[in-house]
Amino acid sequence: MNEDKKTSRGRPKKFDRSHVLAIAQQSYWEHGINQMSINELCKLANVSKPGIYREFGGEDGLTCAVLEHYESRVLSLMLDFLSTETPFNEGLEKLAFYSTSEDRDSDMPKGCLFANMKALRLNLGEATAEQIDRTYEKVINSFEQWINRAKEKAEFKAAHMDSRFAAIYIYAQISFAQSQMMRGEKSEDVRAILRVALSVFG
């Protein structure tokens, strides 16, 4: 029994990748990706800096992995919503509400981590910047397909508008609104402004 204790005491702790990604995502999202150092993340996740570098190859690898994690668990919910058969105007209203909602009983931070990362793209590493570009294209393509389906059903008011341009416009308005949320603006005010910006389609 004593020998078992000695053996287990000498074993290195297993690096929990999922735990580190969850802590990093929450911290970057809540405070801003430019406000959290890798040393602070190591303390929060209770891991060593060499462990981070072994697992992710460095800070750039970590931020890239965090964005992939965020895309699969948060952004995917919004993109899945765009593929439903909800009428376009109703969907646009729900999107505006979802983008500017805050749940005080939830530990989910306000705003959008991806919008924050995209705004600071030039300050991030190469791998993260490339992932930002891939994620952005995925988001815009999803919006574009949603708009094209609305056009086919004659639900899109600005039928003459190029679908990709409209997709970029809608995402830009949502992204700005979420950035305002991260800066602490009242959700009601941000939502009202977003609704006005999107009213060209309603």
Regions found by a protein language model. Name each.
Residues 102-105, 149, 167-187, 199-202:
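Amphipathic C-terminal alpha-helical segment
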Residues 1-15:
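N-terminal intrinsically disordered/low-complexity leader segments
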Residues 126-153, 168:
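Amphipathic alpha-helical packing segments from all-alpha helical-bundle domains
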Residues 34, 156, 183-186:
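Conserved hydrophobic residue
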Residues 68-75:
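Short, basic, alpha-helical segments at the C-terminal edge of helix-turn-helix-like DNA-binding modules
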Residues 2, 19, 23, 27-61, ...:
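Helix-turn-helix
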